């Protein structure tokens, strides 16, 4: 009969395997068998092992290695960690008594069960151990539980009970049944209970019942009472054989999972590291992969943090101390230990040592660098000991690099990031929330510079690791250049979109806070809340994809201008010569219908009794130019344009003559070049004539818009244009293509690309490699891209018959100077063409328009767009790269809110105020019906271009509606027509009015200052 005895100890028993910290990484472990493991295990004593002690590689403690340690076996750098783990395991076996590895916890005060004598896997825990030890208080072991997840607590009392139950003459070693060496037993792979005795009861039952456990079943089962009752039926000889088969070796926790299918004892080394890739692994194993990271703690953390994570050492047998004193002593040892984090490093000396070590080094079976020099023959006892608690992750080492992350509690975000992409820092402002002292130290410029100054690319170990990283799709980046973990989203066309990985808590919308949010943000939140809720419930949201083709029609072109017309300035259609003929300007009288366009009192109406002397001698406070200076400046611009127009006309005539000669000589290359020059010159002439008309109309305006600041002049470079052809196009007839880019009076074109060289192959894309640069562009510039196409003429070769050859020779004999006379006739023809002789007919350009596209500032980047007005053989999509200069930050801000727009065209014939959603961005106010239209990227209903504003400043209108103001605009509807408009607006409240006036006036000040 089993009898309980009370044995009192003078000191609390030693805790050989303290319970770990609560972490998601405790749910999955695997063990790696190396040569050191076989040498330290008594059952593998016959394995030949090299007993020469070696000095550990101190480079893995160096700050140049980064902030974390990687323990992935195939990736290297694990020799020293393996030595440390072997030492911990060897010391545990030497110091620990012989006891049974039992699988049940209960207190001494717990009443025994009726069948307690038969259950040999009951582990007794003294009450003092639980009450005095802070680790047990933290984990809160409940009474009466048959199953406990943390590591087993082993002490002398449990082993003595088990020895007494078996008899005095029997000596039992550590019980550990390994199904890897028993062919008839099935084993659960990657289980936490495979090597610490928690799955022993299940394996006992499998012996008697001969049942097979599925291989993919990774969830251990609790021992059932039926299984425990059948234990005594197992043959004792069979049990002794199983118990002596393999001993438990703790501490070998790596990233390499165990191999479930091993049939012979000699096959352990063959199956090491045989793990499938991340992409090929199933989701269940991929989820476990996120918990198989072992990272050492930071030794620079505050004392409070180190106290909460104790690290027990390896005490001797005779000195048994209490858990509290043991933890304190180990904490003191770690404080005094020098791990090389604070020592000063000489970059040159460090590189020299690493290169010397690389030249004299070899690689072991784990691809780790091993040095055989005599000075490295040092015992492994000098390796700092690493306990189980220190192996819990306090620094998350992932594939995103060496950036240190704060510990995220389990359950907050357990989503795994399989791929990571480094992102450059955009600012120096680092979020200090949730960072300890170690984080601040690691982000110092000195440490960043130190890590960047060590070129490790020429070391064999690093080259091997880089190859392994490429195989496993790992990314390793320096700490100083990159920050923040990101995920890589793979798109259809091969491009990637970077998205930040954020915590779910940060995605929650914060409540309105008057102390942190501005008035504009608060009002925007209030105004858009009902629309956003309706939009989310409706589910009709639309988000444009950045990878697919998009329409880039600029809203400044298709959006009508807001306001009512007040006056018009039109230029006559008579062009003539600007130097001699006077330009006729007609100022249209204001119609009677427009008299009531603005029923409220305007600024001019309030000051009609004042003198008009200021208007006659108008001086702008922005440009400091008088009206006379402006007129002279406009005249100089017009005369300069007229001279340019004359040169363009001469170029057109030369291109026409060259085209006629190329067609007569049947020279295809010269004909294509002449067609290109003729197309460019004719398009440039149209743009120059339109600009002359615009300047002539602008010269008679009394109050033109003030000039824009020269710092807002932009530049844009467009390159790598690729036009897609129709899929049914098979190049039966050869075509030539050209792309023209137009802005104001300038036009640039690419070279002619023909399909003659690719006549036998089928083409789908036409590439243009030119880089076209535009400078001195306005804030709201728009570049029009047009695609032209022509069919390449195919001339037949002259017949070389005998009659033709004889006729040519006879002709040359009779007329020996025919070639000279033909050249003289060509020169006369060219002179007569220049003099515009009667009967001369200019040839037509064979290039035909087949698609267009509008580009603005928002279309910069590597993008793909749709073409408008597409004709065969184009498919309708174009891909290009564009780079645009940035605007000052003051003009690039956005301001949003609701505004009332006055409109007299109401159905009842009365003036009406319509409520619109307005946005001020880059000097233009856009209007939508509601915020949802803006979010869906719809075309605005109307716009106000502040660069065309003639107001010196926008102020509140007196004697009108509450919170009313107006803006005067000068708009060029056509090149020969300028229209003056007045836009009457009103805000919802006085605060809204003040905010809008400040935003508009600040924009005007920045544009004109």
Curated annotation (Swiss-Prot):
InterPro entries (UniProt xref): AHD, Cytokinesis/Rho-signaling, PH-like_dom_sf, PH_Anillin, PH_domain
Task: Kindly give the Pfam families that the UniProt entry links to this protein.
Answer: Anillin, PH
Recorded GO cellular component terms are: actomyosin contractile ring; cytoplasm
Q: What protein am I looking at?
A: Anillin-like protein 2
Presence of the UniProt keyword Coiled coil in the record: yes
Q: Which UniProt keywords apply?
A: Coiled coil, Developmental protein, Differentiation, Oogenesis
Q: In which tissues is it expressed?
A: Localizes to the surface of the rachis.
Asked if the Swiss-Prot or TrEMBL record annotates the protein with the keyword Cell membrane, the reply is no
Domain PH stretches: 892-1005
Q: Which residues form a coiled coil?
A: 626-657
An annotated GO BP: embryo development ending in birth or egg hatching
Role noted for this protein: Required to maintain the structure of the rachis, the central cytoplasmic core of the syncytial adult gonad. Failure to maintain the rachis leads to premature dissociation of oocytes and thereby impedes oogenesis.
Polar residues: bias regions: 542-557
Organism of origin is Caenorhabditis elegans
């Amino acid at each position: 009969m089993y009898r309980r005895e009370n044995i009192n100890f003078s000191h609390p028993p030693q805790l050989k395997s303290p319970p770990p910290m609560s972490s998601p990484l405790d749910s999955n472990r695997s063990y790696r068998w190396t040569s050191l493991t076989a040498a330290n295990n008594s059952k593998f004593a016959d394995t030949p092992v090299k007993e020469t002690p070696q000095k550990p590689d101190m480079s893995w403690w160096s700050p140049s290695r980064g902030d974390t340690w990687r323990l992935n076996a195939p990736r290297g750098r694990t020799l020293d960690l393996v030595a440390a783990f072997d030492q911990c395991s060897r010391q545990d076996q030497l110091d620990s008594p012989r006891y049974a590895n039992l699988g049940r916890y209960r207190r001494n005060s717990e009443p025994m069960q009726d069948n307690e004598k038969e259950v040999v896997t009951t582990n007794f825990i003294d009450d003092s151990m639980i009450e005095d030890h802070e680790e047990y208080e933290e984990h809160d072991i409940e009474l009466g539980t048959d199953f406990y997840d943390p590591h087993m607590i082993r002490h002398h009392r449990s082993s003595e009970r088990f020895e007494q139950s078996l008899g005095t003459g029997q000596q039992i070693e550590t019980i550990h049944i390994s199904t890897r060496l028993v062919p008839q037993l099935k084993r659960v792979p990657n289980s936490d209970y495979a090597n610490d005795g928690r799955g022993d009861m299940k394996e006992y039952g499998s012996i008697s019942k001969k049942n097979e456990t599925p291989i993919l079943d990774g969830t251990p089962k609790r021992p059932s009472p039926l299984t425990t009752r059948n234990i005594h039926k197992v043959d004792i000889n069979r049990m002794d054989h199983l118990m002596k088969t393999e001993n438990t070796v703790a501490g070998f926790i790596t990233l390499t999972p165990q191999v479930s299918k091993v049939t012979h004892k000699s096959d352990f080394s063959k199956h090491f590291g045989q793990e499938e890739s991340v992409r090929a692994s199933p989701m269940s194993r991929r989820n476990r992969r996120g918990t198989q990271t072992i990272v050492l703690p930071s030794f620079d953390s505050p004392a409070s943090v180190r106290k909460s994570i104790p690290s027990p050492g390896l005490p001797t047998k005779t000195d048994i101390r209490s858990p509290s004193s043991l933890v304190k002593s180990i904490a003191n040892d770690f404080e005094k230990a020098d791990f090389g984090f604070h020592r000063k490093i000489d970059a040159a000396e460090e590189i020299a040592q690493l290169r010397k070590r690389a030249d004299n080094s070899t690689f072991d079976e784990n691809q780790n660098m091993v040095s055989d020099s005599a000075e490295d023959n040092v015992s492994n006892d000098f390796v700092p000991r690493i306990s189980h608690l220190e192996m819990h992750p306090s620094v998350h080492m992932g594939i995103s690099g060496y950036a240190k992350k704060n510990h995220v509690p389990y359950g907050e975000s357990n989503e795994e990031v399989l791929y990571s992409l480094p992102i450059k820092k955009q600012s120096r402002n680092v979020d200090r929330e949730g960072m300890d002292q170690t984080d601040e130290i690691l982000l110092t410029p000195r440490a960043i510079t130190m890590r960047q100054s060590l070129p490790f690319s020429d070391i064999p170990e690093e080259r091997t690791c880089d190859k392994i990283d490429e195989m496993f799709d790992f990314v390793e980046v320096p700490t100083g250049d990159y920050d923040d973990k990101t995920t890589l989203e793979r798109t259809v066309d091969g491009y990637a979109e970077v998205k930040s990985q954020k915590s779910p808590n940060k995605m929650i919308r914060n409540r309105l806070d008057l102390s942190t949010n501005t008035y504009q943000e608060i009002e925007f939140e209030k105004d858009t809340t009902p629309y956003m809720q309706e939009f989310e419930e409706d589910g009709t949201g639309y988000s444009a994809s950045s990878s697919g083709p998009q329409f880039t029609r600029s809203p400044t072109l298709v959006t009508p201008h807001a306001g009512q017309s007040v006056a018009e300035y039109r230029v006559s259609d008579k062009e003539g010569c600007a130097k001699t003929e006077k330009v006729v300007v007609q100022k249209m009288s204001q119609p009677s219908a427009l008299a009531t366009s603005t029923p409220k009192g305007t600024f001019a109406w309030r000051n009609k009794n004042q003198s008009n002397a200021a208007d006659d001698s108008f001086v702008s406070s922005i440009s400091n130019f008088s009206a006379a200076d402006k007129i002279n400046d406009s005249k100089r611009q017009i005369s300069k344009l007229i001279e340019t127009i004359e040169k363009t006309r001469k170029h057109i005539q030369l291109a026409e003559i060259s085209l006629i000669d190329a067609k007569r000589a049947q020279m295809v290359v010269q004909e294509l070049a002449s067609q290109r020059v003729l197309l460019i010159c004719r398009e440039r002439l149209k743009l120059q004539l339109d600009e002359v008309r615009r300047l002539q109309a602008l010269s008679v305006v009394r109050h033109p818009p003030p000039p824009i600041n020269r710092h807002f002049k932009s530049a844009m470079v467009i390159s790598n244009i690729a036009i897609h052809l129709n899929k049914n196009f098979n190049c039966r007839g050869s075509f030539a293509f050209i792309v023209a880019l137009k802005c104001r009076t300038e036009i640039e074109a690419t070279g002619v690309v023909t399909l003659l060289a690719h006549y036998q192959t089928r083409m789908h894309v036409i590439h243009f490699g030119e880089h076209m640069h535009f400078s001195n562009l306005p804030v709201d510039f728009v570049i029009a891209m047009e695609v032209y196409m022509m069919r390449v003429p195919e001339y037949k070769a002259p017949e070389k018959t005998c009659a033709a050859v004889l006729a040519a020779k006879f002709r040359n004999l009779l007329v020996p100077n025919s070639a000279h006379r033909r050249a003289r006739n060509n020169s006369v023809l060219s002179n007569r063409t220049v003099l515009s002789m009667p009967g001369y007919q200019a040839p037509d350009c064979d290039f035909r328009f087949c698609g267009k596209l509008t580009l603005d500032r928002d279309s910069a980047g590597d993008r793909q767009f749709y073409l408008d007005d597409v004709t065969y053989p184009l498919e309708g999509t174009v891909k290009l790269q564009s780079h645009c200069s940035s605007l000052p930050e003051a003009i690039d801000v956005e301001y949003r809110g609701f505004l009332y727009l006055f409109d007299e065209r109401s159905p009842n014939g009365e003036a009406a105020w319509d409520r619109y959603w307005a946005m001020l961005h880059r000097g233009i106010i856009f209007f939508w019906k509601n915020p949802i239209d803006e979010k869906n990227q719809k075309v605005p209903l109307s716009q106000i271009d502040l660069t065309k504003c003639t107001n010196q400043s926008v102020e509140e209108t007196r004697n009108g509606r509450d919170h009313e103001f107006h803006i005067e605009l000068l708009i060029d509807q056509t090149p020969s027509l300028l229209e003056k408009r007045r836009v009457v607006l009103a805000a919802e409240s006085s605060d809204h009015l003040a905010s809008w006036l400040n935003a508009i006036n600040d924009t005007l000040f920045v544009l004109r200052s």
